[in-house]
Each structure stands twice: as structure tokens, then as C-alpha cells.
Amino acid sequence: MRRKNQIKKRIIELIELAYNTAKSGNLELAREYVKLAEMYSRKGKVEIPLKYKRMFCRKCYTPLIIGVTERRRMRSKILIRTCLICNWQRRYVLSGNKRSDKENES
């Protein structure tokens, strides 16, 4: 258990380092950090937390920074995230608060 926690901490460190490196302009080094974190995740059988998993492109491993390497668009209740490097797209359905929706129906 202790080993998996160490691996998870290292994965998080690498992804944060990649994000900061990409912000400073070195996308190649940032990609390498993300690839290394992904490899640690696979080899150590540790899942990357969702918050960090959404910080990079699944196709080219580039950290997604709004306006620099990522474009965000809203269509109705759908958020579309597009990587500006490889044009990979991910769609998220945004739902409102279910409790308030039920109260409005009554």
C-alpha cells in the first residue's frame, strides 16, 4: 500500500511539473513528463486521479492550458475541449443540480 501511495504522489508531481513547464513554453519536455507519469500509472497499477487525468490530452500527452494548447466551447449543456496541437476533442455533458430540478417539477 505504501508503494502505491509513493507512485501516486510521483505521478501527481510529474503532471504538475508538466503543466508548469508547458506554461513556461517547453511543450516537448512537458509531454515527456506526462508520458512518464502515464507509464508509472500503468506499471504500478495506480489510477491517475480524475483532476489530473483531465489536465492533459489523451492523444498527444500535451498539458491542456486554456488559450495556449486548449480551446473550450460551450454548446447547450455540453462542454467541448479541443487540443490545439492534435485536434483531439473531448465532450462533457454538464448537468445542473438534480435536487433543484426536482423541486422545480413539483
From Swiss-Prot:
Cellular component annotations (GO), alphabetically ordered: cytoplasm; ribonuclease P complex
InterPro entries named among the record's database cross-references: RNP4, Rpr2/Snm1/Rpp21
Main location: cytoplasm
The record's free-text note on cofactor binding: Binds 1 zinc ion per subunit.
Required co-factors: Zn(2+)
EC number: 3.1.26.5
Reactions mediated catalytically: Endonucleolytic cleavage of RNA, removing 5'-extranucleotides from tRNA precursor
UniProt binding sites for Zn(2+): 57, 60, 83, 86
Molecular function per GO: ribonuclease P activity; zinc ion binding
Key word Nuclease present: yes
Domain of life: Archaea
Function text: Part of ribonuclease P, a protein complex that generates mature tRNA molecules by cleaving their 5'-ends.
Assembly with partners or alone: Consists of a catalytic RNA component and at least 4-5 protein subunits.
The protein, known as: Ribonuclease P protein component 4
The species this protein was found in: Saccharolobus solfataricus (strain ATCC 35092 / DSM 1617 / JCM 11322 / P2)
